[in-house]
């Protein structure tokens, strides 16, 4: 082997070793106790190198280190790069930390980036009920009705967990409440699936009431019969049967139609400008 080739190989190995140490330092796995992120980058660590499935920027978001996220971006980390799971750093940040989300968005992160399952960061923020991340993403242009591989929206993801705070914010931004996924489920039916497992709390009940107000009318029955899992809970079955049997009133159906006609915008601001009495504005905003 020529000396020049040996030097090149040694240089590559050294750079790889530094990059691996960078990942470990960010994740607080102290193989080298005196390592710090800035010194490793100054020494030649590649801020865009992938180790296994991990990239430094994604790792910093996983541990909610906004200062480290900003440092990596300042040093050239690719803000929309994909890791081994085809996820961007924003997908991880959206689950955990508003500060990381804000930094990434400031540096040009795509709020509508898709992972391998076509999930957006907003799907994950809604699922984890990280309400401030939900709001930050929506304010930065995230699609409120983005569809994953199963045609589920962020509202569906929030509803299946009974995440009241996230559901409320998504509805404020005009989320479509009557969306149907590929197997016939709606946001409200996803929430019912949680309630029938006996996992509902007062917050989940409030979430159901909010979705019911937003949808105006819903139907869970097939050929007039409730699903078996609902029928196993007599009290819940009776409540849902009454709601499904009652036709939507003109008032509730008009509320749904008006909200939808306002389009994809922040509805509290849009409704505020309508020439309507205060009581009707509150009604449109699902406050009663």
Swiss-Prot record:
Keywords of this entry: ANK repeat, Cytoplasm, Phosphoprotein, Repeat, Ubl conjugation pathway
The ANK repeat ranges on this chain: 52-81, 85-113, 117-146, 150-179
Tissues where the protein occurs: Highest level of expression in skeletal muscle. Also expressed in heart, brain, placenta, liver, kidney and pancreas.
Changes after translation: Phosphorylated by TBK1.
Compartments reported by the entry: Cytoplasm
Biological source species: Homo sapiens (Human)
Chief location of this protein within or outside the cell: cytoplasm
Recorded family membership: Belongs to the ankyrin SOCS box (ASB) family.
Protein name listed in UniProt: Ankyrin repeat and SOCS box protein 8
GO cellular component: cytosol
Matches recorded under PANTHER family: ANKYRIN REPEAT AND SOCS BOX PROTEIN 8, ANKYRIN REPEAT-CONTAINING PROTEIN DDB_G0279043
